[in-house]
UniProtKB/Swiss-Prot annotation:
It is found in: Cytoplasm, Cytoskeleton, Cilium axoneme. Belongs to the CIMIP2 family. The lineage of its organism: Eukaryota, Metazoa, Chordata, Craniata, Vertebrata. This is Ciliary microtubule inner protein 2C. It comes from Xenopus laevis. The keyword NAD does not apply.
Length: 155
């Protein structure tokens, strides 16, 4: 068996040969992509998917015939670029607004009140002036000896 230290490798350049056991990354199988020594499985698969996205976007055919539209960091279509998507509360504007008829109204009202209390709690933490009041729902109770110590425990 040949080894690197023996110098018995038959390659074009012994310095650049990397044995398969020392190659970085997972060497999985992508049917349409050939594996090279310098690329990891993640880089090869990302390149494969990006090439597919680019060919679909540049063609005049429907993108739904081969799998659809995928969000990516590099694309010809600005709507598919991940950085273009909204990151704030605006992302809920396009969510469906329908409601089911078998809703537990008491539970939904309880969740709405909890959401309001959570917003007030966030405002309390963001407030640097100390004018926002603390929400009593989120105050963690402590044991009585911690808040009112006995005179013997103070010393």
């Amino acid at each position: 068996m040949a080894s690197r230290s023996a110098g018995s490798l038959i390659t074009h350049n012994n310095v650049t040969y990397i044995p398969p056991a020392l190659m970085p990354g997972y060497r999985g199988h992508i049917p349409s992509a050939s594996f090279t020594y310098g690329d990891t499985y993640g880089n090869t698969s990302a390149r494969c998917f990006q090439d597919f996205r680019s060919t679909v976007l540049n063609s005049s055919r429907s993108p739904y015939c081969q799998g659809g539209q995928f969000p990516t960091s590099h694309s010809n279509d600005p709507a598919l670029v991940i950085g273009h998507r909204s990151r704030g509360w605006d992302r809920f504007l396009h969510s469906p607004s329908w409601s089911r008829y078998n809703v537990d109204f008491k539970r939904s009202d309880e969740l709405k009140q909890f959401h309001r209390a959570a917003e007030q709690h966030r405002d309390h933490y963001r407030d640097k002036s100390g004018t926002a009041h603390q929400v009593p729902h989120f105050i963690v109770p402590v044991k009585n000896p911690q808040t009112f110590p006995l005179p013997q425990q103070v010393l």
